[in-house]
Amino acid sequence: LLKPGIKIVVTEGAGVSNTSGTGTWEDIAGRLGKLSDVTAFRQNIVVYAKGSGASFKAFQEMDADAWITWPDWPITHDDVLDQVNIAAARTIWRDVNVALSPDADPEAKEFLTFLVSNEAQEIMLTEGWVR
């Protein structure tokens, strides 16, 4: 991804449609503490898309070489995407944050309990998410 001429698509909400994916590319590029890596990576970005759907579209339309995204995209679109794992030293791990209001109804509480169950973990794994 740092070699000149590689075409990369990234998700960048620009304050409009920020998601957990916004800026992840900077975490990957700068993970080893080298500003030169961030600079080289930045020079290869051809699209800063707002949201993963727009990123997917841009990746296809630009005939890009790489798209920094979450594991569910290549799993659910394996007819057009290939997942390529990056070096372990650059891997970024994110959690799924869930907040339950003190006034939440019982169904919300049940759903949260379900999310941490073995059954839910098996479902999440089918989309590439691990706990």
Model-flagged regions — what are they?
Residues 2-131:
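Exported/periplasmic ABC-transporter solute-binding proteins
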